[in-house]
Amino acid sequence: MAYIEVNQNRHLQLLLNIYEAAPDGEHYTIDGIDCYLTNEPDKAYQFIVYDCGVMQTPTSIFRDADHRLLCGSVLPYEIPVFHKALSECGSLEVRPVAICVPQEIQEYCMELFGEDVQIAAASHDLFAKRANGQIYRPLVEKYIAGEKRL
């Protein structure tokens, strides 16, 4: 699996420094995930997660993806930003994933963003293998051989 940062935020560089990751060719590996600072993977992958950053308008990478997740923190003051990003996707099939939603506004978020919105728990371990598995497993289930559980 590869994680590729295709935005200008450079958050991945900060994380690589914190995790003290050493380069391996064009990527850095953290907990079995190859992380790239550029969209130039040096090998083939079954799964690639592209971090597009803040959604202004959908990028070609986002539009052409097999599965599109629009993930964003949805604290009360962030609702307009998440709503605008979702609106920018237009007719694209997108799975909205709202992160850090306080219990008090979860029902409101489902009314606003639709019943398809997934409410994800905050994961302070970016590379946690089991965090929010109920959201991500259905995306990859048909590609997994055997019964290895996330």
Regions found by a protein language model. Give the residues of each.
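Walker A/P-loop NTP-binding active-site region of P-loop NTPases
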Residues: 1-28, 47
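NTP-binding/hydrolysis catalytic cores, primarily Walker-type P-loop NTPases
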Residues: 125-150
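A broad, low-specificity signal for short, low-complexity segments enriched in glycine/proline
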Residues: 9-11, 29-34, 57-61
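Short acidic low-complexity segments
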Residues: 34-41
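Generic hydrophobic, helix-prone segments enriched in Leu/Val/Ile
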Residues: 15-17, 35, 109, 135-144
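Conserved catalytic-core segment of NTP-binding enzymes
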Residues: 43-133
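Conserved beta-strand termini and adjacent loop/short-helix elements that scaffold enzyme active sites
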Residues: 4-6, 38, 52, 122
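Charged, low-complexity, helix/coiled-coil-prone segments
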Residues: 25-33, 84-85
